[in-house]
Amino acid sequence: MTPEETQKAATLIWEKWDADELLDELPEDCRPQTELEAHAIQSVFPRVSGQPQAGWKIAATSKAGQQHIKVDGPLAGVILKGRILENGAECSLNANAMGVIEAEFAFRFGELVPPRERVYTAEEVLSRVSELCLTVEIPDTRFKALGGKLQLLAECACAWWLVKSEPVTMNWRDLDFKSHQVTVAKNGEKVAEGSGANVLEDPREALSWLVNDVGSRGVSIGAGELVTTGTCVVPVPVSPGDEILADFGVLGQVETRFN
């Protein structure tokens, strides 16, 4: 794709987001044919939206998530600063085509993680992390029929709203993330339960996957960027009026409600 075609695709997707409208698919002259082209479209979103990049998300780190968006593996997506909300925020479901929430662990980097030829281990990645946060993600798509892997990548892997907690204050570095239980209650009733094992076996492994995936394209993870690692529970359907509480046990809770 030419830079002009990349810009056209990103602009079209963003305009549809802004207008609460859906697409059948991207026009043929700006439809990505490779993952590299799809990620190039992502990289333009901060410019076309006027919002700086705040971090990354990982979609489809669990089998349930992969089945939900019809892909066979995880996807990395850019998160824009204007899409991150504080704990307790009210979210709009207006024109949301997916209508689900996900409960996730998120890690903020305290220093730059540059690309390199040798892959980063989970331990090396975690040593560069300064904070753990808890999140509820509200993903969405602008494609009427979940437009296939490449188009989903092009729209930042379904990144939309992300409600996050304050940084966890307890010592979390020795936590067994894999077995740590997470529950979700909707309108006061528990509706989902899972654990970190649903996130590529361990959220820390998912985090290192993201770092190495991004680095393979010559992209750094910036100091201060937040990475939300994928859902610990089966995606929970939500409707306007619902109140959600994601409970991460001793680590804390995240709440949001929908209008």
Residue ranges and their predicted role:
Residues 246:
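Carbohydrate-binding surfaces in secreted/extracellular proteins
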